[in-house]
């Protein structure tokens, strides 16, 4: 087909701004501990909803008229998927529990302050969470049935995020930091003994982190023998592993870009295989992210095939070995994916794939030298239209990301 000549900027397109702006925003995805339910969070027109999908049945709405939304800092950390139901933070400042089966969501905390990053203890009798009230952040714990007032587990730092409880319920790890640092500047990773009967912690140990060393996402192995996390003590990141019995710390992966900036609560980049022999991690290269796995027995690193998607986020692995994550590319709108034995299934979409790919530009990773000799990286989006062409170079529109940690990705 012969293309029609028309100057750049005048090519008609079937893609309208309304089509691009009208999609659903996918926020997070998690497996229930037994792998029987896949739960995700999505937002549309200012309303966030939780959906759950059983293995062989259709997805259903969990949150109804409630509006799940983390209330600490800039948000995030909306929910935690348990075996029997979901614990979520509501915009009114309370934590709620909603069973997967029949029954209404019920509040489990009083309505004051804000909650985020709820974590059910393994017996599912208690919830650990981050709470803020009158500019004071703490780690707290509350019975799942709401029968008692929340108790403070840890206070004293200015900020807290990413609490994690060991599979036996006897240990807790978290990240904390103080003004004027941001979480990508410098944080501290702590490990402590957890007493669920008294709702208290003891034997607090500093594992990693400093004023200039940020830490990200402590996560216990399913067998409870190890704790993994991301650290940045230098130019690039490290994936570290603590053997809880011996106290030995080893570096599994280093000199890669692994740690996303913790702009909000609830961001994840790590996951464990159900046999505790593989650690899954995200790697950022040239504006694209990929899912990798590190085999602890062979030390081999394997790339999980998520083709054709170029930005993957929020990885999680079920007790049955199924991977779920959020994925998108420049020509594929965001969606929730389930990966089972190499087979990829779309569980939810931000919008349908009705947009013709030929009208969507495919970015190319490029770099150039600035006037002061610094290598600058970018994504070049060439004009894309199967029906039109133009003479000469197109006009250049330069979009520079904001802030010290923001980045432009090869994404929709």
Region annotations inferred by a language model:
Residues 10-51, 71-80:
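Beta-strand-rich domains and repeat architectures in extracellular enzymes and scaffolds
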Residues 14-20, 60-69, 104-110, 149-154, ...:
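A short beta-strand motif characteristic of beta-propeller blades
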Residues 33-34, 81-83, 122-123, 167-168, ...:
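Residue-level detector of Asp-centered blade-edge/turn motifs that repeat once per structural unit
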Residues 38, 86, 127, 172, ...:
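Hydrophobic beta-strand positions that form the internal "hydrophobic ladder"
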Residues 42-51, 67-73, 87-96, 110-115, ...:
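A flexible loop/linker signature enriched in serine peptidases of the S9 family
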Residues 54-56, 99-103, 143-147, 195-197, ...:
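Short loop/turn segments that connect beta-strands within beta-propeller blades
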Residues 219-221, 312-322, 326-412:
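Serine-hydrolase catalytic core recognition
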């Amino acid at each position: 087909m012969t293309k029609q000549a028309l100057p750049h900027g005048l090519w008609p397109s079937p893609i309208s701004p309304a089509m691009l702006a009208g999609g659903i925003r996918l926020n997070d995805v998690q497996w229930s501990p037994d792998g029987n339910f896949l739960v995700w969070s999505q937002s549309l027109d200012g309303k966030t909803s939780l959906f759950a999908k059983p293995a062989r049945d259709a997805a259903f709405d969990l949150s109804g008229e409630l509006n799940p939304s983390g209330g600490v800092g800039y948000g995030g950390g909306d929910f935690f998927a348990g075996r029997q139901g979901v614990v979520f933070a509501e915009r009114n400042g309370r934590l709620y529990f909603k069973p997967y089966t029949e029954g209404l969501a019920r509040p489990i905390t009083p309505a004051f302050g804000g909650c985020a990053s709820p974590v059910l203890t393994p017996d599912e009798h208690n919830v650990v969470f981050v709470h803020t009230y009158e500019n004071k952040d703490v780690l707290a714990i509350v019975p799942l049935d709401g029968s008692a007032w929340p108790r403070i587990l840890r206070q004293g730092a200015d900020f807290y995020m990413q609490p994690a409880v060991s599979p036996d319920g006897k240990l807790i790890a978290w990240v904390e930091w103080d003004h004027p640092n941001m979480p990508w500047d410098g944080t501290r990773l702590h490990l402590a003994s957890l007493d669920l009967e008294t709702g208290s912690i003891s034997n607090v140990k500093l594992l990693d982190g400093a004023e200039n060393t940020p830490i990200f996402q402590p996560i216990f192995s399913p067998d409870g023998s190890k704790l993994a996390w991301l650290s940045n003590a230098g130019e690039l990141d490290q994936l570290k592993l603590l053997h809880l019995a011996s106290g030995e710390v080893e570096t599994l992966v280093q000199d890669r870009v692994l740690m996303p900036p913790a702009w909000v609560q609830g961001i994840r980049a790590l996951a464990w295989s159900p046999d505790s022999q593989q650690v899954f991690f995200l790697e950022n290269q040239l504006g694209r992210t990929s899912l990798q796995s590190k085999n602890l027995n062979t030390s081999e690193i394997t790339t999980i095939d998520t083709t054709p998607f170029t930005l993957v986020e929020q990885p999680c692995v079920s007790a049955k070995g199924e991977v779920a994550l959020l994925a998108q590319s420049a020509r594929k709108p965001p969606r929730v994916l389930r990966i089972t034995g190499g087979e990829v299934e779309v569980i939810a979409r931000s919008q349908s794939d009705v947009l013709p790919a030929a009208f969507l530009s495919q970015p190319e990773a490029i770099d150039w030298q600035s006037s002061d000799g610094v290598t600058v990286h970018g994504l070049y989006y060439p004009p894309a239209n199967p029906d039109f062409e133009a003479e000469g170079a197109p006009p250049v529109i330069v979009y520079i990301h904001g802030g010290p940690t923001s980045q432009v990705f090869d994404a929709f």
